């Protein structure tokens, strides 16, 4: 793993435990895992994001009639809740269903309950897989792209829209590295509030926030 970045004569020395690499430019694209980096690398941009767990289950392959009763146009779908449900069919007609769960221990059972609330016709369908992983959220859901220095770039804060935004981020940063930073400067102008208090306060804020948004989704 990288343990430090040192700027030297217009280049960046990327240090590891065993060696070092000299690079003209460096892009930090660690997203929800940025807290694992030393501050000498991230320079405090970790305060702009909050890691939040995302949970997904996958059903067994559905017969075509059942699949069509769920989604019949091949689209990916999400609802308008704050803690939203999102789902699509895979190439082999599995329903991939993502939603909120507050406990990884019983995540599959909670997710199945959420799925059946939307698609009760799947009552007798087996769940083959379930998994979880962190995504990086900003306080106002704006993406956070920019520069720490003239040769150190970063892209984070996709807030659940990484499939669409990561390609855009890569192109915009590549343009800037090649000398055209017009589009990057637009994103650098976005106001992205900071989260303060370190890792433990972030974890507490996440738990409180989930409960608060669940309340809003239920009663608004």
Question: Over which residues does each language-model region extend?
Answer:
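Active-site substrate-recognition segment that forms the wall
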Residues: 4-10, 19-150
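C-terminal catalytic lobe of FAD-dependent flavoproteins
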Residues: 97, 105-218
């Amino acid at each position: 793993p990288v343990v430090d970045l040192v700027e030297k004569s217009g280049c960046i020395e990327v240090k590891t435990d065993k060696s070092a690499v000299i690079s003209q430019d460096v892009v930090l694209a660690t997203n929800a895992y940025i807290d694992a980096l030393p501050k000498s690398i991230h320079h405090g941009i970790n305060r702009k994001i909050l890691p939040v767990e995302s949970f997904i289950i996958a059903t067994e392959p559905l017969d075509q009639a059942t699949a069509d009763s769920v989604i019949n146009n091949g689209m990916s779908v999400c609802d308008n809740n704050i803690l939203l449900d999102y789902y699509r069919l895979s190439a082999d007609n599995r329903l991939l269903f993502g939603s909120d769960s507050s406990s990884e221990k019983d995540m599959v059972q909670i997710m199945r309950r959420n799925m059946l609330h939307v698609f009760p016709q799947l009552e007798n369908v087996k769940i083959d897989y379930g998994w979880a992983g962190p995504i990086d959220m900003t306080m106002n859901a704006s993406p956070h792209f920019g520069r720490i220095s003239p040769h150190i770039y970063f892209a984070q804060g996709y807030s659940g829209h990484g499939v669409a935004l990561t390609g855009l981020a890569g192109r915009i940063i590549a343009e800037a590295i090649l000398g055209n930073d017009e589009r990057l400067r637009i994103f650098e102008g976005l106001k992205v509030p900071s989260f303060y208090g370190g890792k433990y306060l972030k974890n507490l804020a996440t738990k409180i926030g989930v409960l608060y948004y669940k309340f809003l989704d239920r009663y608004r």
